[in-house]
Amino acid sequence: MASYESVIGTLEAELTGVADVFRGLAPEQWQRPTLLVPVDPGLPRWTVLELAGHFDISIGLTRMLIAGREDAQPARDRTSFFINPRSETGPVVYAYAYTMVEGKTSADMPGVLAETFTKTIAEARAVPASLVGPGYFAPMRVDEFAASRIVEAVVHGIDLAQALDVPYFATPDGIAMTAAILDDLLARRTTGRRPQELSADMDWILAASGRAESSDNRLPLIG
């Protein structure tokens, strides 16, 4: 398993790529709809602006974990973080993205994200891998939570690329770690391995996250 410093380095590289894309957007691109379908399909899809709001909170949760350091046994890891009913978590996540961007404009968000991403990496580097804090659902070690943020960055980076109709920009290390976590998630939730036709890691990530169609009835694993 990758070292904590390696995990942080991979997360930093992913977040740098995400921040660079957001920083380069024209005003009208912030209003482009994502392809994400809410749990309630009657609701509007996030635009790129709401996706930025989700990035802010999902990555910023790392800082909350560190600030909430506690003497507790970890109850989840980088894989089990993603074992939860979408019907329950999806509406909360959907609504909170709107809360995060309330009162903000597209001109504000690149700076907001840059600050959140920079502080997240700096604070993660300043604490030991074994630190335990609130991991949203349950206590988690910071190294495990940081690894789960790589999945968030890669998968939602795909959402950003799809909304903008640009090539995917995840790093090889980020893709490899995300694919490995999704492999482990498949093993924990069902039986067997990923389909042979999804042997390429990016193809696997797209199908396992529901960002591409798949004939495998075990998929998607995450929403």
Give, region by region, the residue ranges found by the protein language model.
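Short amphipathic alpha-helical segments enriched in leucine
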Residues: 19-26, 52, 56
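Structured surface interface patches that mediate subunit assembly and partner/cofactor docking
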Residues: 2-17, 24-44, 64-80, 102-104, ...
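Conserved alpha-helical segments that form or flank metal/cofactor-binding pockets of metalloenzymes
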Residues: 48-94
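Long amphipathic alpha-helical segments that form oligomerization/scaffold cores
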Residues: 86-111
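Oxyanion-binding "anion nests"
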Residues: 113-117
